[in-house]
Amino acid sequence: MNDKEMSIEEQIKAFETAANAAATAVPKESILGKTAAEILEMVSSYASDAQVFYRKGDLVNAFAAAAYGLGWLDCGGYLGYMNTGISGCPALESAFPAELMEKLEEKTYRYQRMLTGALKAVSKAPDKETVAAAAASEIFGTVTSGLTDGDTFLPKDMVNALCIFSYWYGWLDCGVRAGLFVITGDRHLFTI
């Protein structure tokens, strides 16, 4: 998690800027290019969703969508599919409108359960002697640590807990799409 806190509005704008600047880093006609295009499509879709939710006043879904999309973008950069570096999970100001707290709490605990289930529903796909296996291990370990980090914010800071759960869920989902993990459990937990 980044040290500097930002507002939800700043987080959404920063993600939108990063998403608009993103491009694939591999030849489009290649197998890797097809996966890169899928990653970029997910990033673009979630940047658009975040803006739509924000304009409608749905701050909960707006910042969760931006965090999830940023997870996809950062994982895509880490894996070499995208031309980006890794931004990291943003730290958000924890102040939140009282009238949205019930929705925030419900979504935060739902994403905690979903990420927990998603981690249990995958296994590493690549052979253990490959670089891809090392990447899968790194992603799995980092996402697991992210889940633990998010748990430490509960129940006092639902904003940052949801941001963390959403961000690391994006990483795991991107790893599945990139072929680093095979789904052994509930496929509905992934966008595959």
Across the structure, where does each feature detected by a protein language model lie?
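Long, charged/polar, soluble alpha-helical segments
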Residues: 1-192
